[in-house]
Amino acid sequence: MTQDKKMVSVVMCTYNGGKYIKEQLDSIVRQTYLPCEIIIQDDGSTDDTMDIVRQYAKQYPIIRITQNELGKGINNNFFSAIRKAQGEYVAISDQDDIWKLDKIEVMLQAIGDKMMCVGRSVPFYDEGDKRVNVHYDERKPNCNIVRMMYASMPGHCTLFRRELLEHLPSHLETRPIYTHTWYDVILGQTAAALDSIVLLDRVITMQRRHVDAASYKDVDTKRLRGMGNGAYIVWWGIKNYHRVKPLMAKHFSVRGGFLESIQSDAPIYKDAVRLMRCESKQGLWAFLGLVRWYVKYRHVMFYTYENDPVALVRAVLNPFMQVYNYRYLLNKK
């Protein structure tokens, strides 16, 4: 692959990232396939972040720096930075991760004619001088639109065509989805709605997580596979269905509304729209509709491919299992 064939813009949004940003920038400027530009947009850092990136910009002219006069917040900051990209492809960078040195090269090779390529990341955290890996699921994930309505692919794992922005609905900033979720969820669901995501099943990013965030180290042991855990999740879902389901209906109403605003001819997209309409309602008919769609897409709607009869059993019980997955909505009431 020659360097002049495809132009890639790297977009990084920063805020008080001075502690780790050097490692990330080093991993980008040392890529085997160099980007045409590195757009760094700062949202009002009060530490030494800007001093560091200015030093790098002197050494690497491909770095373009913008500092917001007023804080934009995550979505406004990322979308405004992405829209400045001049490359045919865009790669999102967090300020504290570490990229594999061939990340851009292998993702360009993998994307083909798709809108988005998604790779894998390994989470880690620093403990003194030690670098400790965090548990993560090594199974190959599904990334079709049915699955993506319940999950997301982190921005730092993606490379996408700038053309993808043209498929976002007009006046995106005024739509409920914009304050409901993050930019990478919006981009991922848009690409999935077009049935245009390819999975690169290899690690391309080391994702730094922070030791003071307990949720990053602790594993919900009830989510680990096993008959006992499965029975507990179903029992919890049945017991709390009446409390959580109304909140889930509101949640999926926003996601479903966004999905319907995307123009796509993909057959799976049309079924995903119907599925979200069932998720957005309550009552027996909506429940039965959910079971129907879960059964139809039982092999591809869970994290990874599942064989029968396990997939069939999970599909039938999934309305209750989903209640457990969305129990966090109780804390947002």
Predicted regions and their residues:
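C-terminal subregions of glycosyltransferases and related glycan-biosynthesis enzymes
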Residues: T174-W182, I186, M206-K333
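Nucleotide-sugar donor-binding/catalytic module of glycosyltransferases
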Residues: M1-T221, F320
